A protein has these predicted regions:
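C-terminal segment of classical bacterial N-terminal signal peptides
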Residues: 2-9
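Start-of-domain marker
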Residues: 11-68
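Beta-strand-rich domain onsets/edges
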Residues: 11-30, 114-177, 181-190, 198-203
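Short amphipathic beta-strand segments in non-cytosolic proteins
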Residues: 53-63, 191-209
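Glycine-centered loop-to-beta-strand initiation motif
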Residues: 72-75, 206-216
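Short, hydrophobic beta-strand segments
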Residues: 76-81
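Exposed beta-strand face motif in extracellular beta-rich ectodomains
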Residues: 82-86
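Short acidic/polar inter-strand loop motif in beta-rich domains
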Residues: 92-101
Length: 216
């Protein structure tokens, strides 16, 4: 089973870090694909440094930047021999999206449960059409080498999920737990959209809300 948790994406397509092997056997490289699409179906993006603000992995407390070449597919292909949990983190450079009508943006804010967005928009004196949005994309994934022991941590992204469950060593009968952060604080009572993919590739989407401590 593969889970993707999402809270902010102002466009129809999501971005996620994927892999053909989240538990690669000994001697094989850890390969991470940068995917863009919907419901786990999408294009495998090439690596371009002008689209990447930061791209790194951490294992056993040691951080390493991904040093891919322009146009590389997959975006990350690294030989990692040490055992343990590998946390891969990606942040894009900013992109600009123009809305020519309010309706398209309204669909987004309704879907993402931002009820105060219109009031905030108009109170700033912004127009209801022809306005622009700047957005970043953030994505993390967990890979296991060998025993897969280890834990996720907060890397200081503007918004991020921090896994509180290690899916490779913890009992998943109790579920997978994560904590959502925005800035330096847990984000409470936020809608979380979850995409769940089973081993056969079937995808189910459902919604949860974070608690008072940002946990879901």
């Amino acid at each position: 089973m593969f889970l993707k948790l999402q809270i902010i994406s102002a466009h129809a397509h999501e971005l996620w870090l994927d892999s053909k092997q989240f538990q690669p056997p000994e001697g094989e490289k850890v390969e991470i694909e940068l995917r863009n699409g919907q419901n786990f179906k999408g294009i495998n993006l090439s690596y371009f440094n002008n689209r990447t603000k930061q791209f790194f992995w951490m294992q056993n407390g040691a951080r390493q930047d991904v040093r891919s070449r322009l146009g590389d597919v997959p975006a990350m292909s690294v030989a990692i021999d040490d055992e343990g949990l590998i946390v891969v983190v990606y942040e894009s450079t900013p992109s600009i999206l123009t809305y020519n009508s309010w309706e398209k943006f309204a669909n987004f804010i309704n879907h993402k449960d931002f009820p105060d967005a219109k009031n905030s928009h108009t109170n700033r004196g912004l127009p209801l059409k022809g306005f622009k949005e700047q957005y970043h994309r953030y994505s993390k994934t967990l890979v296991a080498r060998g025993h897969g022991k280890g834990s996720d941590r907060n890397f200081g992204l503007e918004t991020e999920f921090v896994a509180q469950t290690n899916p490779y060593v913890d009992d998943l009968e109790a579920g997978f737990r994560a904590q959502l952060w925005y800035g330096k604080k847990p984000r409470k009572n936020a809608q979380v959209e979850i995409f769940e993919r089973d081993p056969e590739g079937a995808v189910v989407t459902f919604y949860l809300r974070t608690d008072l401590h940002g946990r879901v």
